[in-house]
């Protein structure tokens, strides 16, 4: 029995190492490639975040920012995971600096921190936004700010 368990452990560890080395997992001929997330346990400006206390709801949006287009200064009151599907985006966080994101990058957006997005490059910045919101009207809607913090 011990030899069997040792063999299983070696196989599991070997398979685990192979998965980590290739950063993809295969299950029933379906390949799942992890999406790199900048600062997984904090927002991209270093804030800890918590899920909303009310009834949870996951909301998904396809957001498009044209080249040269600026968003208004705004902030989010709930956690938002953003994934850049195409193009590039520059976000001004005022005293926290400017961060650039391009196709294939993911991040947890700042919470209750005023910021402004700018579409950069020659193509639309297309973002998949997943809001971990509350099941209440406008819980995922950005709040307009006067300017940078």
Per-range role (PLM):
Residues 112-138:
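Ligand-binding loop in jelly-roll beta-barrel domains
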Residues 71-76, 93, 118-120:
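Short histidine-centered beta-strand/loop micro-motifs
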Residues 65, 95-112:
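Short acidic-glycine-tyrosine-enriched beta hairpin
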Residues 18-57, 143-149:
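A short, N-terminal "cap"/entry segment at the start of jelly-roll beta-barrel domains
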Residues 53-57, 68-81:
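A short beta-loop-beta micro-motif enriched in histidine and acidic residues
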Residues 6-16:
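Bacterial N-terminal signal peptides
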Residues 63-69, 77, 113-115:
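N-terminal post-signal-peptidase region of extra-cytosolic proteins
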Residues 76-95, 105:
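Glycine- and acidic-residue-biased ligand/ion/polar-headgroup-sensing regions
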